[in-house]
Amino acid sequence: VRSPLLWTLIASVALLFGVGGWLLTDPATSHSEALKTGGLAGGAVVALYALWLNDRRRRVEEARQAIEQQRHDVDRERISDERFAKSVELLGHEADQVRVGALHALAGLARTRPEYRQTVLDVLCSYLRRPFTHARYGGLEGTAEQERELQVRLTAQRLIRDLLPPSDVDGPGPDLDLTGAVLEYFDLSHRRIGGLLLRHASLYSSTNLSGCVFTGQAYFTAAGTGPGRLVGLFRCRNATFLDRAWFSGTAFSERATFSETTFAGRTTFKGATFAKEVLFDGATFSDSAEVRLPDGWELKPQNGGFVAVPV
């Protein structure tokens, strides 16, 4: 098989002699003009070949770079998967500092690879759903092991908040499943959250959901704030529930604040108990037929919606 270069040279020489010979048949054309024109025709073929060759080299280089990028992406994904698997494995390590390191490694992975964020949040939530008790919840002094595990869990809580987007961004937020979790100083304030499951969760010390935007359904069914020394303050001021907000059977052992909060979907506090005061001043609801408030509060029409006022 002859190379394109050989065919180009043959075509160039053929044009040189062909065009030159044809022009020489014209008596008005000199020998120098005929050779010059033939040379230009042959040179044009060579120039076209050079352009084709340059384009071919460019396409080959682009293909090589694409292959290199694919190889890099595959290696990066493999390393990320290995890093994720190793971090999850270390969450079961006996040493608390190793577990804390594994939590930070997972959070770091979620920051550098956004596609891992929901998966990492699922792992952090599953860690917090593990059975846990601390003597301090009963007013006693806990063991060293309980205290170490508490610090690991507080780290997981902080990392969850850090990985959630701010409340003022657009789009749905990540989902959190904390069903039955034991939480202390739980703070998601000013974050954007998709669905939130806190069914049967135990909330000790303060819980702060102020300024949150919930784009999915939020369930606090049968959750409870802690009594005793670690009083369960529940703050949900100026939050927004775009979908269902379910507080049926929730037990609030200390003051609960829902001031200036917007409930855009179905909302119920049926069966909820409040040991201290509950505040709904400035809270708005989209449809009174879909709302059940605790005793002592009622809805009044306002600006096309409804606002909660004390009875």
Label each PLM-derived region with a short phrase.
Residues 3-82, 89:
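Membrane-embedded hydrophobic alpha-helical segments
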Residues 70-73, 82-107, 111-138, 142-311:
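N-terminal leader/targeting and pre-domain segments
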